[in-house]
């Protein structure tokens, strides 16, 4: 079966966190523990809660759900943990268990999940946000959810170098020809929040191969993170079917890419979908990962200094750090940022649900960006870009925030 029962999810979470020996190595790297300094905000505290819940030592309550929801799922604790306890995965399972016992997901998450399950509604929302930007009313939206997009045209006007680069370098590992079926997975965040960046991604991909057009569904991460597991699995099956004929599936959203690469784990016990899911996950690549494989060079070198923010779902979710940096070094000057891989506080809807904590995390990121002296901070995740756009505005014009597809 591809759907675990509530008890199975809790049992699995208990097994995951049972490896925690409470050493506390996770606490210094947890952004939320750094903000709150409370045991339950860090992985050690959450692991203790999950284990007690699985063992029957504490009762499931709505308050307990609030505690496990207060997690960025950034995986910083997992990377630091000597035992590699997957606290993020355990928290997702515990959330699902507690959500089901509470009678279902919160109404706002059901609403968001319902919107993202319908591509036509997502497209309509994208058009509405575009209209708001043109009218100047986007600033009325809270939490930066209708950001002003700093486009490639703006960028080239301000930072264009004297000459475009030459032809692309020979492929370093994978040969992609006109016969290779490369598909672009356009995430909801890119389509609604940063459509110009999504268009730039398509333009870049067309320079490397003949792009296969596919109208994908949401990756399902918002559903998985908020106790809507059935919706997540339904979307996963739809995307697996849609992309079965593609050779490569490229994502320019770190969150989408990480989710799609791990779909196989959710169907490991389902004979009907196990192999199909594994085949799909195996051909998903991040945009920068793909471009490194085919030897892509930026379209133009800019008179700009870049710095880079590592999305959690790219650096820890996919283990990708160097490809985006190498592309930025080829596109202009590059300077490394302090704590570049620390979460920006976006984490899906976390910055909406917990604006104070997210704001404190983001303020640290702003200071680190400004210390680089860079003119542009670049990232590869629309969720992160929403956050970075906020601090770019707060900086008073000291820097701009852009998706990597817009500068290469």
What are these regions (language model features)?
Residues 14-33, 61, 65-85, 341-342:
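Cysteine-centered iron-sulfur cluster-binding motifs in ferredoxin-type domains/subunits
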């Amino acid at each position: 079966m591809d759907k675990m029962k509530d008890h199975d999810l809790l049992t699995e979470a208990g097994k995951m966190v049972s490896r925690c020996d409470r050493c506390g190595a996770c606490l210094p790297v947890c952004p939320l523990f750094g903000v709150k300094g409370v045991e339950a905000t860090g992985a050690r505290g959450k692991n203790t809660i999950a284990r007690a819940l699985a063992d029957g030592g504490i009762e499931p309550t709505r308050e307990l759900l609030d505690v496990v929801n207060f997690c960025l799922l950034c995986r910083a604790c997992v990377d630091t943990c000597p035992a590699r306890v997957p606290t993020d995965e355990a928290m997702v399972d515990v959330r699902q268990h507690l959500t089901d016992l509470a009678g279902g997901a919160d109404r706002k998450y059901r609403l968001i999940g319902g919107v993202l399950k319908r591509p036509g509604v997502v497209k309509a929302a994208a058009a509405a946000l575009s209209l708001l930007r043109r009218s100047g009313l986007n600033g009325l939206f809270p939490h930066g959810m209708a950001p002003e997009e700093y486009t490639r045209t703006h960028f080239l006007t301000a930072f264009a170098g004297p000459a475009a680069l030459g032809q692309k370098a020979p492929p370093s590992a994978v040969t992609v020809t006109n016969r290779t079926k490369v598909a672009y997975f356009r995430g909801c965040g890119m389509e609604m929040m940063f459509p110009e960046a999504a268009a730039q991604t398509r333009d870049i991909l067309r320079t490397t191969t003949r792009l296969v057009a596919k109208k994908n569904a949401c990756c399902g991460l918002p559903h998985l993170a908020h106790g809507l597991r059935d919706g997540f699995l339904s979307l996963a099956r739809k995307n697996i079917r849609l992309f079965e004929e593609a050779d490569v599936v490229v994502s320019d959203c770190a969150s989408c890419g990480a989710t799609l690469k791990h779909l196989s784990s959710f169907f490991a016990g389902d004979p009907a979908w196990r192999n199909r899911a594994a085949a799909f996950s195996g051909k998903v690549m991040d945009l920068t990962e793909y471009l490194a494989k085919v030897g892509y060079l930026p379209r133009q070198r800019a008179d700009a200094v870049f710095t880079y923010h590592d999305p959690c779902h790219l650096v820890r979710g996919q283990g990708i750090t160097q490809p985006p940096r190498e592309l930025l070094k080829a596109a202009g000057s590059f300077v490394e940022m302090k704590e570049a891989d620390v979460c920006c506080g976006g984490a899906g809807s976390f910055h909406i649900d917990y604006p104070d904590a997210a704001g404190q995390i983001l303020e640290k990121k702003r200071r680190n960006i400004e210390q680089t002296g860079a003119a542009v901070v670049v990232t590869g995740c629309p969720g992160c870009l929403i956050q970075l756009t906020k601090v770019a505005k707060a900086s008073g014009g000291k820097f701009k925030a852009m998706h990597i597809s817009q500068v290469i």
